[in-house]
Curated annotation (Swiss-Prot):
A GO biological process held by the record: mitochondrial thiamine pyrophosphate transmembrane transport
Species lineage: Eukaryota, Fungi, Dikarya, Ascomycota, Taphrinomycotina
Molecular function GO terms recorded: thiamine pyrophosphate transmembrane transporter activity; thiamine transmembrane transporter activity
Membrane topology: Multi-pass membrane protein
Gene3D superfamilies, per the entry: Mitochondrial carrier domain (1.50.40.10)
Residue spans of the Solcar repeats: 14-95, 102-185, 190-274
Major subcellular location class: mitochondrion
Name of the featured protein: Uncharacterized mitochondrial carrier C1604.04
Pfam family, one: Mito_carr
Length: 283
């Protein structure tokens, strides 16, 4: 077994709760810090407006606290999604460590599968977060949940699910593929710096590739009755706003995803290393 394979074997052989805890902690901290970018990005996508007027209108009419609107739901979303994604990826990597396949392909497939699993696990929270971010006033969680259920039943919590799977699966696959490749090159810089820089590179690259799909999915989640299908929504945005409409909010999203992924991966790797040290026989 080569050094890289041996490192992977050790890295992905930790107890499941290590990845759950590290993934959950890193995702929750990340979410709190990037919440304002997420609120503005979602409003730009669903209103097809630009950054300055959306930010100005939000703060003037609703106050600074509006930038964290729906953050309780979003924190739960990030906790569930982050824990599920990192657990799934680590266990899949452990299971495929002896697979005779290109490392980049394995990372992509494991990342895609992890993203799909995490999406299915956390999707109702994602739907509620998107709706809350678009409201002018912060709704109470229980009444809002009851309202969604009364209007559309269980399906109301899963609008555009298949399209989210199509978007998030490949996004997660690209992220982990780019991250592992970047981290392998940058590892001589040390764990903290290599994980931070690799998170920025992988997050930005993956987001740029999948952003148009994200715009359509967010629009479908917010206005599910306005469109017949993913294609209908895509064409409607394109006809009304062109290519720019599909990338509306990309600049804000990049401001969010670059530091967000840097924070997530830095805290995740450091937490995982700490748990590994504490669990070692020598500790």
């Amino acid at each position: 077994m080569g050094l890289a394979k041996q490192k992977d074997s050790q890295e992905f052989a930790q107890p499941v709760w290590h990845y759950t805890l590290a993934g959950g902690i890193s995702s929750v901290i990340c979410r709190f810090m990037i919440a304002p970018f997420d609120v503005i990005k979602i409003r730009m996508q669903i209103t097809q407006s630009s950054l300055r007027p959306v930010f100005k209108e939000t703060v003037q009419k609703e106050g600074v606290r509006a930038l964290w609107r729906g953050n309780v739901v979003a924190e739960l979303l990030y906790l569930v999604y982050g824990a599920a994604e990192f657990v799934a990826f680590s266990k899949l990597k452990h299971l495929t460590e002896n697979l005779a396949m290109n490392d980049h392909a394995v990372n992509f497939l494991c990342g895609t599968s992890a993203g799909i699993f995490a999406t299915l696990t956390s999707y109702p929270l994602d739907t509620m977060r998107t709706k809350f971010a678009s409201y002018a006033k912060t709704p109470h969680m229980l009444p809002a949940t009851k309202k969604i259920y009364a209007e559309a039943g269980i399906k109301g919590f899963f609008p555009g699910l298949k399209f989210s799977v199509i978007q998030i699966g490949p996004y997660a696959g690209c992220f982990f593929m780019f991250y592992r490749a970047s981290e392998a090159v940058l590892s001589p810089l040390g764990l903290a710096l290599s994980s931070t820089l690799s998170g920025v590179i992988a997050g930005a690259g993956s987001k740029a590739i999948m952003f148009p799909v994200d715009t359509v999915v967010k629009t479908l989640q917010t206005f599910p009755s306005n469109y017949k299908s993913f294609k209908d929504c895509f064409l409607s945005i394109y006809r009304n706003s062109g290519i720019k409409g599909l990338y509306r909010g990309l600049s804000v999203s990049m401001l969010k995803v670059a530091p967000g992924r840097a924070i997530t991966m830095l805290i995740y790797e450091q937490t995982l290393q700490g748990l590994r040290t504490l669990s070692s026989p020598e500790a």
